[in-house]
């Protein structure tokens, strides 16, 4: 049986990076494996679940929504036995899920506000991953929320400047200015490795929109830049 998965592979990376960062920044425990599997199953569920609101192929999307939800529940049981309070982070996601549903109903999934809602959901997943092992809510949990979120907002603006909004100069300048501000903020705060983490994104935001690249090329470059960002983020904060 072939899995029903969205072809937005970049979103998978966006869903996993904050979670893994939160786990590594905290004290990883065995139950994190089940929490990760449960979270990933929930993420996979979002594709068929949101498509239910389009009113087409309902049986197919109902089937896969149930399959992924069941998998999420099964994987989550050991994690919830370890720390059930992580559910609070899931409840905090619900308003942003409502935003996703709203834009899906309007057939406007590419709306920037919809993208931002998704990024905030991923940030909450990262916060939950950090909190999970020791029930710690401190300054570092804000790092988990803020640093990947800034990076992925920049990524979203850049991708729009390369693809659907290529002819809209506002997205190009928004992408460049946002990346530049992120780098400058960390330079001013003397967090130089964090500033360096945003430099590859800034370079590609300035340079690549002038080039004609295929969707695959854009995706591969983005994967490499995300990997560099993540490595430098770990070096700067672990």
Curated annotation (Swiss-Prot):
The chain crosses the membrane at residues 19-39, 64-84, 85-105, 112-132, 141-161, 176-196, 218-238. The keyword Transmembrane applies. It is found in: Cell membrane. InterPro entries: YwiC (IPR025576). It comes from the Bacteria. GO terms for cellular component: plasma membrane. It is a multi-pass membrane protein. To B.subtilis YwiC. This is Uncharacterized protein HI_1626. It comes from Haemophilus influenzae (strain ATCC 51907 / DSM 11121 / KW20 / Rd).
């Amino acid at each position: 049986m072939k899995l029903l998965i969205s072809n937005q592979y970049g979103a998978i990376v966006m869903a996993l990076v904050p979670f893994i960062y939160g786990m590594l920044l905290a004290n990883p425990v065995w139950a994190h494996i089940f929490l990760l599997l449960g979270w990933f199953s929930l993420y996979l569920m979002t594709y068929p679940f949101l498509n239910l609101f389009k009113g087409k192929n309902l049986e197919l999307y109902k089937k896969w929504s149930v399959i992924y939800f069941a998998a999420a529940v099964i994987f989550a049981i050991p994690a919830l036995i370890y720390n059930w309070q992580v559910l609070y982070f899931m409840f905090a996601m619900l308003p942003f899920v409502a935003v996703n549903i709203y834009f899906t109903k309007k057939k406007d999934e590419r709306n920037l506000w919809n993208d931002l809602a998704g990024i905030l959901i991923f940030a909450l997943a990262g916060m939950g991953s950090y909190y999970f092992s020791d029930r710690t809510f401190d300054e570092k949990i804000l790092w988990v929320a803020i640093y990947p979120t800034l990076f992925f907002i920049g990524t979203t603006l850049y991708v729009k400047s390369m693809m659907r909004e290529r002819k809209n100069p506002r997205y190009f300048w928004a992408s460049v200015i946002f990346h530049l501000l992120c780098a400058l903020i960390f330079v001013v705060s003397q967090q130089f490795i964090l500033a360096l983490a945003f430099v590859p994104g800034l370079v590609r935001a300035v340079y690549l929109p002038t080039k004609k690249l295929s969707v695959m090329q854009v995706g591969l470059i983005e994967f490499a830049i995300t990997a560099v960002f993540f490595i430098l983020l770990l070096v700067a904060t672990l």
